[in-house]
């Protein structure tokens, strides 16, 4: 017990008789905030507050304590017209909010002295009754929280929060950096659209859409708002600034790295590499600075972004001088329109007519160019890699068997254009209707070749289009390896050559594809013209691959590990083809022997097939499929260019082709393939 300067020493009985406020003032520790020179304590009867004891005792707000008047406890701030200033405390990053929890701190004008921080802590031994009597705010000293022990409506704020403080009637705005936590009232809430709002006792004002308020110091020490559109507004002193969130807490972005916060739509915002954050909204994403500025968007209007260059210059020039208001990092992200999906183009074959053809292979250049007439490229190396997937994506959105179709997509890829296929019922595939293929499949269902072709289930109408429904050949395989081999000594019909000669039209796309494979292939005239005719290109195409030397060529291979190779345009020599086939089966002699057996059975069926003898089979492929279980099968696919011969005419399918004899060299190529695979299986 220390001696009171105006009274003698007190014994315990006398001390107990004093009012609680006076006794607490006597017991307060030394070393609190000192008075400035020239400011004397007013004597008795000098207009002291009613709470001051007789004899010039301590003020109701003593050194080291933080007492508030009754209006402040009610959350109303100082009484109107009050001119008496209130003391300001300097703490180690912690503020003393009013009882209403609005994060308000008042300060004495033009007085800022930093006392000994040890004197700012109050004794924990004071009873709860004493605290209730004096409305004292205490600092626990254990977890760094400023708490009001009698407020039940306060909630803690995360550690990285930084309060916005409001001065008294005549005081400036200040911002205090905190490292601890501060309690905030749960009832301080506003509409949760992440806009800065100014809550007034009479009205609620909102900032203009797209404006990003910040603060800048002026010459007289007051604070002004700085909007992202360059305008400034004098600060209103009637109420505090609050940053509303959906949970009622007030938060401030860390100056070093922004935290991720949920947007109005519940989406998670993504962290940029420079520390700023992007907040998506209901109709688009916006980019917001990582520190003090928020580019919020109300639900009833769009956000207008200012010019990036003007905004950045304005913010940095006005805010970099303030140590209390870190410069916000604002990044304007231009909106990039999402690329629209490419529509599925019309089929390259003329449907429904005797001269119409479906695609025989997605890797056959000449097939896609023969009747297209539009210069579309079918070579997978010449087309965009995403284009087939866009077509497939459009196709699959109508399918109830998406997973099954994706699993078996390699067969579609190796056997025809993805845009010509859709998934049918389980175990079936829908291929765009072609009358030539329809007639061929209907006849093959009654032919000895029936086991070697996909089962045909007739025509179906789906989504306004007609399809041929056939068997999914990969339904019984697990992780299959697939190879597509184009059979025959030519892949174009004689009628196509005749039509091309009747209407010759040099094509630039044919020239470009020819030069891409062999720059020296075009003649000097073709080089000068920059174009070649279709017959010239088709005949040259056959001579570049093993079609002209072996009667078949490898179109594409998809391995079980997912690798796919279609670069076989120059695979012509026997040694090259042998190496590709050996790699396809990974040197598995058992698989090779099964393939040889299947091909021999197919050859026997072809030699006795009435259909095969009376049809010119051009552009058809053999589909090789095997998997890790040892299952291996071969099918004939793609009959879009299979046409019937004139009456009483048959083909051997082994004779060399000469224009007019209609020989296709199918069996010649099959004989060479069987011989080659037999050699691999026996080696």
From Swiss-Prot:
<dbReference type="GO" id="GO:0005524">
    <property type="term" value="F:ATP binding"/>
</dbReference>
<feature type="short sequence motif" description="Nuclear export signal">
    <location>
        <begin position="324"/>
        <end position="332"/>
    </location>
</feature>
<dbReference type="GO" id="GO:0005829">
    <property type="term" value="C:cytosol"/>
</dbReference>
<dbReference type="GO" id="GO:0032958">
    <property type="term" value="P:inositol phosphate biosynthetic process"/>
</dbReference>
<feature type="binding site">
    <location>
        <position position="641"/>
    </location>
    <ligand>
        <name>substrate</name>
    </ligand>
</feature>
<dbReference type="GO" id="GO:0000828">
    <property type="term" value="F:inositol hexakisphosphate kinase activity"/>
</dbReference>
<feature type="binding site">
    <location>
        <position position="558"/>
    </location>
    <ligand>
        <name>ATP</name>
    </ligand>
</feature>
<keyword id="KW-0963">Cytoplasm</keyword>
<keyword id="KW-0597">Phosphoprotein</keyword>
<dbReference type="GO" id="GO:0005634">
    <property type="term" value="C:nucleus"/>
</dbReference>
<comment type="function">
    <text>Catalyzes the phosphorylation of 1D-myo-inositol 1,4,5-trisphosphate (InsP3) into 1D-myo-inositol 1,3,4,5-tetrakisphosphate and participates to the regulation of calcium homeostasis. Can phosphorylate inositol 2,4,5-triphosphate to inositol 2,4,5,6-tetraphosphate.</text>
</comment>
<feature type="region of interest" description="Disordered">
    <location>
        <begin position="147"/>
        <end position="308"/>
    </location>
</feature>
<protein>
    <recommendedName>
        <fullName>Inositol-trisphosphate 3-kinase C</fullName>
        <ecNumber>2.7.1.127</ecNumber>
    </recommendedName>
</protein>
<feature type="region of interest" description="Calmodulin-binding">
    <location>
        <begin position="509"/>
        <end position="517"/>
    </location>
</feature>
<feature type="binding site">
    <location>
        <position position="486"/>
    </location>
    <ligand>
        <name>substrate</name>
    </ligand>
</feature>
<feature type="compositionally biased region" description="Polar residues">
    <location>
        <begin position="267"/>
        <end position="289"/>
    </location>
</feature>
<feature type="compositionally biased region" description="Gly residues">
    <location>
        <begin position="44"/>
        <end position="58"/>
    </location>
</feature>
<dbReference type="GO" id="GO:0046854">
    <property type="term" value="P:phosphatidylinositol phosphate biosynthetic process"/>
</dbReference>
<dbReference type="InterPro" id="IPR038286">
    <property type="entry name" value="IPK_sf"/>
</dbReference>
<feature type="binding site">
    <location>
        <begin position="507"/>
        <end position="513"/>
    </location>
    <ligand>
        <name>substrate</name>
    </ligand>
</feature>
<feature type="binding site">
    <location>
        <position position="431"/>
    </location>
    <ligand>
        <name>ATP</name>
    </ligand>
</feature>
<feature type="modified residue" description="Phosphothreonine">
    <location>
        <position position="336"/>
    </location>
</feature>
<feature type="modified residue" description="Phosphoserine">
    <location>
        <position position="127"/>
    </location>
</feature>
<dbReference type="GO" id="GO:0016607">
    <property type="term" value="C:nuclear speck"/>
</dbReference>
<dbReference type="GO" id="GO:0005737">
    <property type="term" value="C:cytoplasm"/>
</dbReference>
<dbReference type="InterPro" id="IPR005522">
    <property type="entry name" value="IPK"/>
</dbReference>
<feature type="binding site">
    <location>
        <begin position="471"/>
        <end position="473"/>
    </location>
    <ligand>
        <name>ATP</name>
    </ligand>
</feature>
<dbReference type="GO" id="GO:0008440">
    <property type="term" value="F:inositol-1,4,5-trisphosphate 3-kinase activity"/>
</dbReference>
<keyword id="KW-0539">Nucleus</keyword>
<keyword id="KW-0547">Nucleotide-binding</keyword>
<keyword id="KW-0112">Calmodulin-binding</keyword>
<feature type="binding site">
    <location>
        <position position="638"/>
    </location>
    <ligand>
        <name>ATP</name>
    </ligand>
</feature>
<feature type="compositionally biased region" description="Basic and acidic residues">
    <location>
        <begin position="105"/>
        <end position="124"/>
    </location>
</feature>
<feature type="modified residue" description="Phosphoserine">
    <location>
        <position position="404"/>
    </location>
</feature>
<keyword id="KW-0418">Kinase</keyword>
<feature type="compositionally biased region" description="Polar residues">
    <location>
        <begin position="196"/>
        <end position="206"/>
    </location>
</feature>
<feature type="compositionally biased region" description="Basic and acidic residues">
    <location>
        <begin position="249"/>
        <end position="259"/>
    </location>
</feature>
<dbReference type="Pfam" id="PF03770">
    <property type="entry name" value="IPK"/>
</dbReference>
<dbReference type="GO" id="GO:0071277">
    <property type="term" value="P:cellular response to calcium ion"/>
</dbReference>
<keyword id="KW-0067">ATP-binding</keyword>
<feature type="region of interest" description="Disordered">
    <location>
        <begin position="334"/>
        <end position="387"/>
    </location>
</feature>
<feature type="compositionally biased region" description="Acidic residues">
    <location>
        <begin position="297"/>
        <end position="308"/>
    </location>
</feature>
